[in-house]
Design a protein with these regions (language model features):
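Glycine-rich, proline-tolerant flexible connector loops at the mouths of alpha/beta enzymes
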Residues: 19, 44-68, 134, 192-193, ...
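Alpha-helix-loop-beta-strand connector modules within alpha/beta enzyme cores
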Residues: 9, 56-85, 148-155, 208-216, ...
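Catalytic alpha/beta core domains of metabolic enzymes, predominantly
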Residues: 124-247, 258
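Mid-to-C-terminal alpha-helical segments outside catalytic/metal-binding sites
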Residues: 266, 270-291
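Histidine-centered catalytic micro-motifs
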Residues: 9, 28-33, 43-55, 80-85
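Conserved, mostly hydrophobic/aromatic
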Residues: 31, 38, 49, 125, ...
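N-terminal small/glycine-rich loop or linker at the start of catalytic domains
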Residues: 1-23, 87-96, 126-133
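Active-site beta->alpha loop and helix N-cap motifs at the rims of alpha/beta catalytic domains
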Residues: 61-139
Length: 291
């Protein structure tokens, strides 16, 4: 029998999407409740960003992360917690003076970007091994920054999830594994597909990136927007795990907004089981990932 498939649920993200679907959770209570609901629907992992409760905009406030994590743990939910470290990597140059950062730039130190991880000690945290045009904004993660973040994360006892958005990012992540920056005999990669202007969300691209990974790696993949569910099926076929959630896609079907993260997880579970595979529970997921 093939290995059970782990479903991860990305609950809210950092995009300006809270007004596009009322189901997008904003407050720590809403985010924690969505985590618990997604877990009950079949997600063994929840991937967490936080938002300013007043504005709905993305936030890096460690107090908000702590409240979300505490609420999930206090509820006794067995879900594996995965916190983001993505915010703090946006550099926008002034058009007339490119060496000068524009007002929309948000660049933080490694310590600032992982402070909530060190404090809350989740099971996993994402590490964006990527410098790219992320839509209309440059995302900058220099190798020295990534190395320092990886060290701080692992010193806190947390497993890095290496998020890669194109083939060059896979090469850098592999280099970090090969040189011992990532000290993990089961390194975890997330193949992020369909984001402008990274790798497209196709089965061919997923396969190409998968074939670049170390033999001992665990991997998952996701596609954004209308590619979310096709990429679930592709990941199952290609031997990986999958991710869904309102961070990546606001719709359950064409023109129909998802009622919540649990609905997206339930659909992913249906796809996995219809393909003859088993959905991993939290215990199985921990064993697979070496947590």
């Amino acid at each position: 029998m093939s290995e059970p498939i782990i479903i991860s649920c990305a609950l809210t993200g950092a995009a300006d999407s809270a007004g596009a679907n009322p189901a997008v959770p904003v407050t720590p209570e809403e985010i924690a409740n969505e985590a618990i609901a997604a877990n009950k629907a079949g997600a063994a992992i929840v991937h967490i960003h936080v938002r300013n409760p007043e504005t709905g905009k993305a936030s890096m406030d460690p107090k908000l992360y702590k409240e979300v994590v505490d609420r999930i743990r206090d509820a006794g939910a067995p879900v594996i917690i995965n916190l983001t470290t993505g915010p703090g990597a946006r550099f926008v140059p002034e058009l007339d003076n490119p060496s000068q950062a524009a007002a929309t730039t948000v660049m933080k130190t490694a310590e600032e970007r992982v402070a909530h991880v060190v404090e809350n000690k989740p099971d996993i945290c994402s590490l964006d091994v990527a410098t790219m045009n992320f839509g209309d904004r440059p995302m900058v993660n220099a190798p020295d920054m990534l190395n320092k973040m990886a060290t701080l994360i692992q010193d806190a006892g947390v497993k890095p999830e290496l998020e890669v958005f194109d083939t060059g990012h896979v090469r850098l992540a592999n280099h970090m594994v090969e040189t011992g920056v990532i000290k993990d005999d089961k390194p975890l990669y997330q193949l992020c597909l369909g984001i402008p202007w990274g790798a497209p969300a196709t089965a061919e691209m997923m396969m190409a990136m998968r074939d670049m990974l170390p033999a001992n790696a665990n991997w998952a993949s996701f596609g954004i927007s209308r590619f979310e569910f096709p990429m679930v099926a592709s990941a199952v076929l290609l031997g990986g795990h999958c991710r869904v959630g309102l961070e990546d896609n606001l719709y359950i079907s064409r023109g129909e907004l998802a009622s919540g993260n649990a609905q997206l997880v339930s659909r992913a579970k249906e796809i996995i089981e219809s393909m003859g595979s088993e959905v991993a529970n939290e215990k199985q997921a921990r064993e697979i990932l070496g947590l």
